[in-house]
Amino acid sequence: MDFSELDYQAKVRDSLNKILTDKCSQDELKNFDDGFKHDDALLSLLAENGYLGLGINEKFGGSGEDLYDLGILFERLGYYAAPLSLTGCLVDVAQTIQKFSETETHKSILKSIVKGELYTSAILEPNNQDPENPITKAKFNGDKILVNGVKYLSEIASVAKSILVSVSSDEGVLLVLIDKDKVKLTPLASTANSPIFKVEINDVTLDQSSIIHEKGRGLEALRYLLQINMVMRSYIALGVAEKMTALIASYTSEREQFGRVIGTFQAVSHRAADCFIELECLRLVNQQASVNLILEGITSSEEIIRVNNIKEDASI
């Protein structure tokens, strides 16, 4: 079977490599070691060159490609350790709105995202291991919604315009957009110095137009969001694993011990080969999962688990 990329996909990959090689050098990345890990200049450059429109329909200003092509973007961001956290914006918000919303107000958000405006999501909750059943509550009051709850691990929430939040209500699960200024944000520490936040939602009143999906499709939309998020994060892990494998190949072909290049030692070459095999397995299951999401909308939970397991194995 031929798993090679199409010509335009190779061009997307090559052009991203040129941009990120320059903007994500070691010297550039050091600037974000101790500060807020978000590069506005790089975000603007990606927007100007149309990369934020990957996976977004042309009628919304996107480039019209599919989720596989969006995966190329996240793979390259992972490879170069780019100081950008875009899964909340380009995946959770953009892809979910594109698939489940029919209103012009929400569709206009896609156009603004393509131009570089940031949105994010807040789905995970403390003490809740089942994201499909949110603890955060929404109560209907006429044409308004009153929301209360706590979310955490929300990426770049402090610089996002709005936050997509999952809530439980009398009408089932809902996905609603909340303006950043209506919630309390608390920065959270992380080993990777990622810009993640705790989001406290206290008696926030919203219009029902803040619901991004049709009535009765909230749980379906949330499941889709969770699946596509995991797949795209796996693409980031693929990029990281590819960089690690490249570093291993470089080091073992140059370092000498006992008068020989260590790459010629059987144990070293076997471990390096194992890394390469895990890398290509991760690439293949990512391709399969993204293609199935395109064809079927929601892929099987077993397939998502397989993607996650291979991602973890490759990381080890």
Question: What do the PLM-derived regions correspond to, one by one?
Answer:
Residues K115-P126, V165:
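A short, Trp-centered hydrophobic/proline-enriched beta-strand micro-motif
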Residues D92-S101:
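Helix-loop "lid/cap" segments that line or gate small-molecule binding pockets
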Residues M1-Y80, L84-S85, F100-T103, S112, ...:
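Alpha-helical interface subdomain recognition
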Residues E132-N148:
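Cytochrome P450 C-terminal beta-domain/meander region
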Residues N133, V150-V183, P187:
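A short core secondary-structure module
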Residues T191-G218, A246:
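Internal glycine-rich alpha/beta core junctions
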